């Protein structure tokens, strides 16, 4: 679904391809050849499952390189009736005043329109007006980073027809219209960052990127236990319980690291792992709460928080989040 046009019909999933990403870190391509290899492998998996080829794709990007700007645009309406062309013009005007040096605009998403003295208008097309204003979110990405992504796809024979920030695609995949109307925050815990998107009255009210994600938990475990990142990732996935250390009398156990890597001879306690991971997740949730406080919405969203992303798979994240955010919390599913 196009987040800028939610009235388009939903799509069906025909094929899925998942491979380990070795050429990208924090949303930036560090090894073009590895990136292209990963693309080719994942695309082949998806095409084999679907039984057809996909020469054209739309992609979503995440990472700390994406910037979010909030700005206004205003135009005169010569015909005294707002058309779709007028809406497009005023959205383009919203870019004025924003420094776009070495940046490319990915998407412009309207928050609300004003038609003369009428404010908080959702869809102004067809309304009588002499002046049209918009409050809009402008999503940008470093031009070089975008060009490298496009080149990688082109080199494996794929035409990129559209690019979306994952801050827009994740909520569209998991949130209902009712949730967006009543008030909800979508929290996308990725590897290098966490996306926060707030909706009320059916429109996006806030979007931000927190530069902390799941790989920080892995790094903390690697340092705390003195193991490799690969072993730490396996410990995080298989043994971490985010509320284990909060139990009144946790039944601790020693985990033999040789279960993961035969070269390892030490053990680590499940309680210690829980303490390491919980500290970092509490930091992420605290930073999310800071964003909600800026809106005056901390503990004040009726539909609560919906979690997505690889980092949301942590065991008992929902219980921890309910305590830290003081909101109803769930895992989001398409």
Regions found by a protein language model. Give the residues of each.
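Feature representing long, continuous alpha-helical segments
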Residues: 219, 271, 275, 279-286, ...
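Short glycine/serine/threonine-rich phosphate/pyrophosphate-binding segments
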Residues: 171-172, 192-197, 314-315
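Generic beta-strand/beta-sheet core signal
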Residues: 60-62, 166, 187-190, 197-199, ...
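Nucleotide-binding motor/catalytic cores of P-loop/tubulin-like NTPases across gene-expression machines
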Residues: 299, 303, 307-334
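Short beta-alpha connecting loops at secondary-structure transitions
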Residues: 205-206, 219, 269-273, 302-303, ...
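Glycine-rich phosphate-binding loop of actin/hexokinase-like ATP-binding domains
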Residues: 182-224
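Residue-level signature of catalytic and energy-coupling elements of molecular machines
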Residues: 59, 153, 188, 221, ...
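Nucleotide/phosphate-binding catalytic cleft detector across ATP-hydrolyzing
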Residues: 2-186, 203-205, 214, 228-276, ...
């Amino acid at each position: 679904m196009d987040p800028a046009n939610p009235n388009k019909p939903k799509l069906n999933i025909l094929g899925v391809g998942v491979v380990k990403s070795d050429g990208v870190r924090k949303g930036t391509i560090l090894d073009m050849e590895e990136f292209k290899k990963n693309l080719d492998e994942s695309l082949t998996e998806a095409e084999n499952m679907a039984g057809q080829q996909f020469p054209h794709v739309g992609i979503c990007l995440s990472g700390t390189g994406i910037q979010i700007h909030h700005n206004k645009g205003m135009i005169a309406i010569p015909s005294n009736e707002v058309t779709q062309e007028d809406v497009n013009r005023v959205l383009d005007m919203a870019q004025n005043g924003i420094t776009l040096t070495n940046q490319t605009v990915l998407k412009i998403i309207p928050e609300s329109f004003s038609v003369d003295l009428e404010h908080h208008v959702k869809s102004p097309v067809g309304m009588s007006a002499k002046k049209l204003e918009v409050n809009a979110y402008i999503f940008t990405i470093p031009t070089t980073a975008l060009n490298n992504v496009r080149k990688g796809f082109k080199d494996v024979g794929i035409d990129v027809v559209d690019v979306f920030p994952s801050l827009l695609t994740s909520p569209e995949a998991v949130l209902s219209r009712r949730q967006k109307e009543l008030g909800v925050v979508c929290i996308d815990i990725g590897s290098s960052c966490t996306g926060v998107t707030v909706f009320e009255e059916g429109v996006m009210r806030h979007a931000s990127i927190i530069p902390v994600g799941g790989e920080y938990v892995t790094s903390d475990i690697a340092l705390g236990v003195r193991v490799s990142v690969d072993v730490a990732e396996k410990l995080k996935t298989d043994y971490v319980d985010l509320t284990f250390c909060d139990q009144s009398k946790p039944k601790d156990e020693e985990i033999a690291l040789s279960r993961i890597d035969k070269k390892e001879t030490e053990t680590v306690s499940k309680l210690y792992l829980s303490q390491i991971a919980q500290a970092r997740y509490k930091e992420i949730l605290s930073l999310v709460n800071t964003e909600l406080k800026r809106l005056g919405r901390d503990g004040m969203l009726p539909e609560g928080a919906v979690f997505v992303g690889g980092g949301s798979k942590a065991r008992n994240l929902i219980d921890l989040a309910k305590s830290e955010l003081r909101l109803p919390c769930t895992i989001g599913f398409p």
